[in-house]
């Protein structure tokens, strides 16, 4: 699900979240 942050030029700060299509998501 969406983690509430974007990641176009910066990494995801929320633990467990990763970048998919410029959005930070997790596996849930």
From Swiss-Prot:
Entry's Gene Ontology BP terms: defense response
Cyclopeptide (Glu-Asn) crosslink location in chain: 1-28
Tissue and organ expression note: Expressed in fruit, pedicel, leaf and stem but not in root (at protein level).
Modifications after synthesis and translation: This is a cyclic peptide.
UniProtKB keywords: Disulfide bond, Knottin, Plant defense
S-S bridge residues: 3-17, 7-19, 12-24
Coiled-coil segments: none
Family the UniProt entry places it in: Belongs to the cyclotide family.
Written domain comment of the UniProt record: The presence of a 'disulfide through disulfide knot' structurally defines this protein as a knottin.
Function comment: Probably participates in a plant defense mechanism.
Name of this protein: Chassatide C12
Species assigned in the record: Chassalia chartacea (Chassalia curviflora)
């Amino acid at each position: 699900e969406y983690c509430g942050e974007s990641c176009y030029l910066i990494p995801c700060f929320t633990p467990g979240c990763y970048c998919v299509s410029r959005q930070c998501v997790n596996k849930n």
